[in-house]
């Protein structure tokens, strides 16, 4: 396996590999761009529900949800990526993931599909593949006429770890 493929495998939490050369991903849309995350990091996908705002929480935290008795912070990927924030629609979803031992949700415009792709079609992200920070991108998959941006959840939410802990503490108080 090439150094790039090793990096991608390590970047995708728990590696959603189906076979030696397959990745299994959940794909979704945010601000017209298609993204994907490793299916093994995804705990569930929910329709939008009412979020409870937490006083004095930072702007990247939209609020918290009570999911079967567990308080889960929810972030809006539009806000996180610096896109124009918009109201949720009937297609909006909350994707609940586990990242670095923390469970959190993030809002996406819509979920597309679960997809298996050959690891060989994934390349390192060019610097200007998207308007988001390339540090958050594990790679880019080329599927026919579309680009699939694979997110590195660990890096994407690492800066929010302390914020999330404070939000959870405030919500529990």
Predicted regions and their residues:
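An acidic, low-aromatic, low-complexity terminal/linker signal
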Residues: 1-173
């Amino acid at each position: 396996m090439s150094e790039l493929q090793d990096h991608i495998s390590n970047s995708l939490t728990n590696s959603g590999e189906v076979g030696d050369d397959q990745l299994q991903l959940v794909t979704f849309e945010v601000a017209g761009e298609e993204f994907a995350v490793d299916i093994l990091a995804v705990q569930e996908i929910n329709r939008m529900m009412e979020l409870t705002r937490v006083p004095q929480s930072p702007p990247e935290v939209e609020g918290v949800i009570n999911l079967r008795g567990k308080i889960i912070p929810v972030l809006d990927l539009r806000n996180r990526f610096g896109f124009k924030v918009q109201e949720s629609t009937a297609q909006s979803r909350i994707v609940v993931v586990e990242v670095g031992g923390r469970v959190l949700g993030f809002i996406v415009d819509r979920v597309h599909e679960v997809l298996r792709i050959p690891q060989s079609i994934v390349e390192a992200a060019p610097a200007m593949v998207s308007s988001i920070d390339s540090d958050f991108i594990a790679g880019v998959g080329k599927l026919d006429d579309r680009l699939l941006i694979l997110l590195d959840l660990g890096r994407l939410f690492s800066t929010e770890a302390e914020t999330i802990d404070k939000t959870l503490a405030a919500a529990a108080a």
